[in-house]
Amino acid sequence: MELVHQQQQPSHLLSLSPSPSPSPPEQAPLHPSPMATSSPKTCFVTIGATASFAALIRSALSSDTLSALGKLGYTDLVVQYGQDGKELFDSAMQQVKTAGSSSVNVTGFDLDKAGLGKYMRQAKGGGSRGGQEGVVVSHAGSGTILDALRIAVPIIVVPNPDLLDNHQVELAEALAEQDYVVHGKLERLPKALQDAEQLRQRQKAWPPVNAGVQREAKGLKGILDEEMGYLD
């Protein structure tokens, strides 16, 4: 029987049959949103339940603030706008949507009878939701400040200039001097957000180095009372 030997094509010769052209590489979006590139990071803004604070709502939803949040890696902005703030919030949100330049997801609500703890914990990060540690931006109410300090989330305290007394300013200045909070100003909220990033690093050595064992033993309420002059 005649054997037929098939001659193998030398390995150095290229096949003449056309090979499929490679598919072009996928291009990343020019401006990826933080939501798509990083874990959640929340800024929670609260004006409290007793007094309106329209100026803080406007400042939080301004293009400068939203831009600063995006640059700092924030993915979410949650605004508690109070019982009289819905119309203002909706109007500001319409401007945000019209501009269409923010990558931050913005939501809001008036009041929550269950309290603000879950929103502060969302800003704290970690837990079941995961995510990075964010920040709380608050009016200078002592109760709200205490809640944020207990959760150990960085807090920016913004006094309301429309109130008749200056106790909020005094409280914000005293706590900022001791490195417990950032004293924020309405017209400079983006700067306060930058300062909060630095405060975050310093607070890893909580409590502040100048607090001392005796001040630490007084607890947060005792520290607030001491700073405001309410001594036993």
Language-model features: locations:
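Donor-nucleotide binding loops and adjacent catalytic segments primarily
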Residues: 2-5, 10-16, 24-133
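C-terminal amphipathic helix plus adjacent low-complexity
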Residues: 3-5, 29, 197-232
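Hydrophobic/aromatic beta-strand patches that form the interior of the parallel beta-sheet core
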Residues: 78, 107-109, 137, 156, ...
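Acidic/polar active-site rim loop that often engages polyanionic ligands
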Residues: 153-154, 174, 201
